[in-house]
Amino acid sequence: MNQIKKLTMAFVMMATTLQSNAQTHDSFANFARYASANEQLAEPKEGEWRVVLMGNSITDNWPQTRPEFFREHPNIIGRGISGQTSYQFLLRFRQDVVSLHPAVVVINYGTNDIALNTGPYDEKQTFDNVCSMVDIAQANGIKVVLASCLPAGGFGWRPEVTDAMQKVKSLNARVRAWAKEKRIPYIDYFSAMLSADGKEMNPAYATDRPGIHPNAAGYQVMERLLLEALGQLR
């Protein structure tokens, strides 16, 4: 009887641990954020050129800040989640990109990795995460556009990161060189959004200082570059 009781207790503890881990994994990737929207999204119609934007708060805030852009381009679908890093993008890439059957995915990477949002920053690992997303997309017949990390003079929520701009430049250079080698279109948001002194996001394009999040004017700059890049793929 004692042995059965011990086995029962062990099973309960194991099940609790598995459930806890599952909840932790789900909350880390935030699969629930777009689960309902993904289910309700119809399959692309014949001739529809669906584009999915994968990213963080910069992508997440875009439809709220510039809803008219998405009304004019209903084929462009945002799948950004505020605060997320490339590690989380990779976890939810199948659910929030591949399952939507887009023709193109645009990946805006890096900001929150550098801001240490999910742990210590490792440029090579962030780069590898980007490469893995590209591999998954291409294996599923999805074209890829890589979009640079935007200028970041610092992070208000992470003051200990004192070399943000140097890290942004280094990561962008690495991804851009690889994109050129692989003939993957690359959008240089960084240069277009940089301040005149090269130290931060242009204040005219930012909602905050140091600039991390674009305002409506900043998104309009990004929209022009995005449409140019997409136009080259059609």
How would you describe each model-predicted region?
Residues 1-24:
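Bacterial Sec-dependent N-terminal signal peptides
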Residues 22-103:
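Serine-esterase "nucleophile elbow" of acetyl-processing enzymes
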Residues 78-82, 109-110, 114, 118-119:
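Cell-envelope and extracellular/periplasmic
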Residues 106-110, 130-131, 145-147:
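Conserved, well-ordered alpha-helix/loop/beta-strand core segments that scaffold catalytic motifs
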Residues 114-119, 123, 154-158:
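Extracytoplasmic/secreted cell-surface and envelope-processing proteins
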Residues 122-131, 165-171:
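Charged helix-capping and loop-helix junction motifs
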Residues 140-143, 184:
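A short helix->loop->beta-strand "cap" motif at the edges of active sites that frequently abuts
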Residues 151-234:
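Catalytic His-Asp segment of secreted/periplasmic serine-dependent ester chemistry enzymes
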